[in-house]
Amino acid sequence: MSDAPWEMFANRLRKRAKHLAKWARREQVTCYRVYDCDIPELPLVVDVYDSHLHISAYAREDDEKRDDAWLELMRVTAAAALEIPPERAVMKRRAGQPGTSQYGRVDESGAYFTVSEGGHRFRVNLRDYVDTGLFLDHRVTRARVGAEAAGKRFLNLFCYTGAFTVYAAAAGAVSSTSVDLSKTYLEWAGENLRLNSLDRPEHRLVRADVMEFLARSGEPYDLAVLDPPTFSNSKKMRAEMNLQRDHVKLIRATLDRLTPGGVLWFSTNFRRFKLDADALGAARIEDLSRATLPEDFSDPKTRYCWRIVR
């Protein structure tokens, strides 16, 4: 068998796709991870979104070997191995480690399309932004939040495109408030609500700095999701945020908005994150990182997740 990198890559993709096929059909999952830096020499992440591919190439010290021609070879190899038209396979260079999120625009194609997950519909865009609009590593977490949402007042902080809000609203949350600084992502969240016939007055979208919102909001909530970026120095924010340094303040401020016994789902993709549980003053803290890791994700450090009860 040849040791050519593209052949190793193709063989691994075919093997993983075959392994995941039965699970994906059974769970009605059409968006999933099929390759996650499985071969050390090939630091790529490949996600399937229906009949499209989103491929991320992560920076490494020996990056001079991975020029544009190499990336193009990997792109067409992935498309061929997974029997997807090459024009539907998107390759992006990314800095940092897999699991880091970088908000930002990289193109202007306007190439949105709709995918399904858990009986809900979501808009995604594989070309124009660093991320796609739907974080696949939160698939199980979204379902868990939805399972708790009936009859609850729901708060979604750093809401991105509002996928958690869709799950909560569809499950019967009596109201929801989704907060983000980005006008683009709030509009996207609004479109996701509309796609699911959930664009009603009780589901509010608020453009605000999260800490400022928490400081001024007196409204009580029963269930919340807090999934902040690792770092943020947005000009619109009052102060630069460093999650490791600031997480206690951020979590406590969120818990203050919850009713007694209210539940906060807190998550981060920061691989070196350490939760200061003793400083939170919570009634109960459960580490559900492994319990919420989807079937198609093998790296336990993809993201961390806690269920925190006030």
List each model region and its residues.
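Non-catalytic accessory regions of SAM-dependent methyltransferases
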Residues: M1-H52, Y58
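Conserved SAM-binding loop of SAM-dependent methyltransferases across substrates and taxa
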Residues: T161-A173
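Conserved SAM-binding motif I beta-strand of class I
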Residues: S175-D180
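S-adenosyl-L-methionine
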Residues: L181-V225
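C-terminal catalytic and target-recognition region of SAM-dependent MTase-like enzymes
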Residues: V263-R310
